[in-house]
């Protein structure tokens, strides 16, 4: 069922990532919520945002304000998925997600978010990058995405926001605490 292969996993020449979805109502490790408290901004709950696995979030293992906070990643479905962990999604569907959180290597995330502490590591399923997609307003499951395998590439947030307003803009990320550090 997985279409990505090799080490690192690739599909049609592009790097692959595993995905899951979550909702926790917290502002996340990029500080995308009011400075006082732990609540998230409304746009952070309902937009295309993601928690990245540790090595991508910050190669120095920071748990707050990682080096890729605010970066946008275009995910394109391969039509594959990890058997027993998701379901098929048509190949070629692309959506862009902004990194606003960390998927920590702690329970229950170890199988997905543990890529080790050095570049080139991979999770239990063979992926160098894992993205846990915010589903606070069913924005992920509402598209029919059930933990699809994807390819990924870094893209410009504002260009993607202009195409689909569910992708946060750079000015929206500017409200986050980590945008000012």
From Swiss-Prot:
InterPro entries: RlpA-like_sf. Optimum temperature is 30-50 degrees Celsius. The active site is at 24 (nucleophile), 132 (proton donor). It comes from the Eukaryota. Gene3D superfamilies: RlpA-like domain. Digestive gland. It catalyses: Endohydrolysis of (1->4)-beta-D-glucosidic linkages in cellulose, lichenin and cereal beta-D-glucans. Disulfide bonds join 4-16, 30-69, 32-176, 65-178, 72-157, 103-113. Its EC number is 3.2.1.4. Keywords: Carbohydrate metabolism, Cellulose degradation, Disulfide bond, Glycosidase, Hydrolase, Polysaccharide degradation. Optimum pH is 4.6. It is an enzyme of class 3 (hydrolase). CDD domains: DPBB_GH45_endoglucanase. One of its GO terms (biological process) is cellulose catabolic process. The keyword Disulfide bond applies. GO terms for molecular function: cellulase activity. Belongs to the glycosyl hydrolase 45 (cellulase K) family. Active towards the soluble carboxymethylcellulose (CMC). Possesses expansin activity too. This is Endoglucanase. It comes from Mytilus edulis (Blue mussel).
